[in-house]
A protein has these predicted regions:
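ATP/adenylate-binding site constellation spanning eukaryotic-like Ser/Thr protein kinases
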Residues: 10, 22, 65, 135
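Short connector loops at helix/strand junctions that flank enzyme active sites
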Residues: 20, 35, 42-44, 61-65, ...
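A short local loop/turn or secondary-structure capping micro-motif enriched for an aromatic residue
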Residues: 43-44, 56-59, 99
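Short beta-strand segments
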Residues: 20-52, 68
């Protein structure tokens, strides 16, 4: 068996991000790095995330640099992974007309994943915070095996 690894192209990275809905967000917290799974939607140069008020949000406001990883694993040597590095922004509809427009766009984008988000029937009503991550750097890898 021959195992090969290669970098994914920018288009392949975007395709994997578009095909996934759960990623792992890594961020600095009390002299360590924490990582948490969460739902996201990719849209252009941005990832839109939804969370609740708490420790993660408090830390992200003070240390906005994050990484988000998504992957598609079919076997030990049959997988693809994308890592996005960027800065996170808290979206607040009270930040004037531009803030309201960013919030409305984020909610509409997130509703592609969860149609009832921020509406009657919302499956996670306690998650009232919308964030977006600017995809400053995106890279991906793929492993594959062949019987050569």
């Amino acid at each position: 068996m021959s195992i090969s690894f290669r970098a994914l192209s920018a288009d392949e990275c975007q395709a994997l991000l578009a095909s996934q809905q759960v990623g792992r967000l890594a961020y600095a917290y009390k002299q360590r790095v924490d990582i948490e799974p969460l739902h996201f939607v990719a849209d252009g140069e941005w990832l839109y995330l939804r969370t609740a008020h708490g420790t993660k949000l408090a830390m992200l406001v003070h240390q906005p640099w994050v990484a988000l990883e998504v992957d598609e694993v079919h076997g030990l040597f049959d997988w693809r992974s994308v890592v996005v590095h960027g800065s996170v922004q808290l979206l607040d509809p009270a930040d004037g007309p531009d803030g309201q427009a960013r919030w409305d766009h984020a909610v509409a984008t997130f509703r592609r994943l969860v149609p009832a988000a921020f509406a009657v029937g919302d499956p996670t009503p306690a998650r009232t915070v919308m964030l977006r991550v600017h995809m400053s750097h995106v890279e991906g890898r793929q492993a594959s095996a062949s019987d050569a």
